[in-house]
């Protein structure tokens, strides 16, 4: 297994410099990670540097709380694509999920999927705030709305992905969607276990440490 090909090498903290982004990009190229995941303001720069390297550019929409209107998320998505984004990680309307508002959740996700024009869309459901029934509910709606992935976390909640989250999502989506585990992945062993349980992608800012078999200190943004 080539662990590097599962990793979205991520830098989404509130204080990020151009130097930080260039380091992220350099590491992604060196280790051939699947993508770099950066805030929208860095997409064009990342795209220009990653052209021809095989590393994708991923960005976030409705980040970090998912409280943007669907039309705003759609606009963000279109602009990100213009800047060069290959993949979109959107934060779902978590309140709509917790309220079991099927219409709101579907409208939210569909707005981004439509705006993405066939590009990969990962729906961040923020599992830290959901119980198993709610995780199942939103995961199934994400599939119906045309999302490519269900993603566990933003990095701004009380915790990241757990093995239990991955198992619950996998049971809900089967082979109809992929799964991205984000956060809570502090070692190579953690990463391999997430993959074993159904994760197809790993979101982490500790990708270099993971592939080297080192343990992250946990003070990272994923």
UniProtKB/Swiss-Prot annotation:
This protein's name: Deoxyribose-phosphate aldolase
Localization (cell): Cytoplasm
Reactions it catalyzes: 2-deoxy-D-ribose 5-phosphate = D-glyceraldehyde 3-phosphate + acetaldehyde
The entry's keywords: Cytoplasm, Lyase, Schiff base
Primary location group: cytoplasm
One Pfam entry name: DeoC
GO BP of this protein: 2-deoxyribose 1-phosphate catabolic process; carbohydrate catabolic process; deoxyribonucleotide catabolic process
Active site: 89, 151, 180
Gene (UniProt): deoC
Pathway field: Carbohydrate degradation; 2-deoxy-D-ribose 1-phosphate degradation; D-glyceraldehyde 3-phosphate and acetaldehyde from 2-deoxy-alpha-D-ribose 1-phosphate: step 2/2
Matching SMART domains: DeoC
Species of origin: Acholeplasma laidlawii (strain PG-8A)
Enzyme Commission number(s) from the entry: 4.1.2.4
